[in-house]
Regions:
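Short, glycine-rich nucleotide/cofactor-binding loops
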Residues: 14-18
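A generic structural signal for solvent-exposed, polar alpha-helical segments
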Residues: 19-21, 142
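Catalytic-loop motifs flanking and including active-site residues across diverse enzymes
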Residues: 21, 25, 225
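Histidine/acidic residue-rich metal-binding segments in metalloenzymes
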Residues: 81-100, 108-230
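Generic structural signal for well-ordered alpha-helices
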Residues: 26, 49-60, 86, 119-123, ...
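Histidine-rich, glycine-flanked metal-binding segment
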Residues: 1-5
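N-terminal cationic-hydrophobic initiation segments that often serve targeting/anchoring roles
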Residues: 30, 56, 60-63, 90, ...
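Divalent metal-dependent hydrolysis catalytic cores, especially in the metallo-beta-lactamase
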Residues: 10-12, 25-51, 66-78, 94-108, ...
C-alpha cells in the first residue's frame, strides 16, 4: 500500500466552546470531518450526563442542514467525579471518553484534578469498562519550568498510571516533546499531535519580538522536539 486516501477524517481533539464561537467552528469542522471528540472544558465544564446531553444538543442544532457530523462527547474529570455517572454515561453512549485536566493547566481547567492518585479508583473502573482516558499531560507546579512540564508529568504521574493500569486505554493529548514520543512508543498508549506543534518551534514565539499568536498550551518546544513529532 503506497497511498491511503482519507475521504472524511475524524478530529480527535476539538474545542467548540460555546455560543457564537461554537456556531462558527462547527460549520468548518462538519464540512471536513465526519466525527470529532469534543473537549469538555467549557466555562461550566461538562461533568454530568445531563450537561453532556445538553451540550451535544446545542452542537447538533448548530450543524448545517443535512449534515451527518457526529460529536463524540467527553466528561471532565474532577476530584469529585461520580463513579456511577461516569460509567453509566459511557455504557449508555453519552460519553465516548473521560478527559483529565490537571487543575489550572490550561483554558477553563480551574475545576480540574488537584491530586491525580485520588482518581485511581475511577481509572480502575475505566480500565474494566474499556473507557478511554484522555490526558492533558502537564504538571502545574510553580517551581517547574514551563518548557519541562510535559516531561515532569510523564515521570511523576503518567508512568505511575501506566504501571498500575496496564490495560487502561490512554491517549496523551497534544504531545510536544521527543520525551513524550519515546514514552508513547515504548508503552501501550496513544497520542495526539497538533499541526501547530508540527509547524513551529519555540523560536516562533520570540522572533522579532513577542509573537503572542504562536502562544498556546502546551507551549511549543525546541526544534529537536518538533522534528521528533514529525
Amino acid at each position: 500500500l503506497k497511498t491511503l486516501n482519507i475521504i472524511k477524517p475524524d478530529d480527535w481533539h476539538l474545542h467548540l466552546r460555546e455560543g457564537l464561537v461554537l456556531k462558527n467552528i462547527i460549520q468548518f469542522t462538519s464540512e471536513y470531518f465526519g466525527r470529532a471528540i469534543v473537549m469538555p472544558n467549557t466555562k461550566s465544564p461538562i461533568t454530568s450526563i445531563n450537561s453532556a446531553i445538553s451540550y451535544r444538543k446545542s452542537i447538533v442544532e448548530a450543524l448545517p442542514e443535512s449534515s451527518k457530523f457526529e460529536p463524540l462527547m467527553t466528561i471532565y474529570l474532577t476530584d469529585d467525579t461520580d463513579k456511577g455517572e461516569l460509567i453509566n454515561g459511557f455504557k449508555n453512549n453519552v460519553f465516548f471518553a473521560a478527559k483529565l485536566y490537571p487543575a489550572n493547566a490550561t483554558t477553563n481547567s480551574s475545576h480540574g484534578v488537584r491530586k491525580i492518585e485520588n482518581l485511581y479508583k475511577i481509572f480502575e473502573l475505566m480500565q474494566d469498562s474499556g473507557m478511554p482516558l484522555l490526558i492533558h499531560g502537564e504538571v502545574t507546579d510553580s517551581e517547574v519550568d514551563v518548557f519541562d512540564r510535559e516531561e515532569v508529568f510523564i515521570d511523576k504521574e503518567l508512568s505511575q498510571i501506566t504501571k498500575r493500569f496496564p490495560k487502561l486505554k490512554i491517549v496523551l493529548e497534544h504531545i510536544t516533546t521527543s520525551y513524550a514520543v519515546d514514552f508513547v512508543q515504548e508503552n501501550n498508549i496513544g497520542a495526539t499531535i497538533t499541526p501547530h506543534h508540527l509547524h513551529i518551534n519555540r523560536n516562533a514565539m520570540f522572533f522579532g519580538g513577542l509573537n503572542s499568536d504562536f502562544y498556546c498550551l502546551p507551549v511549543a518546544k525546541r526544534e529537536n522536539n518538533r522534528l521528533a513529532l514529525r
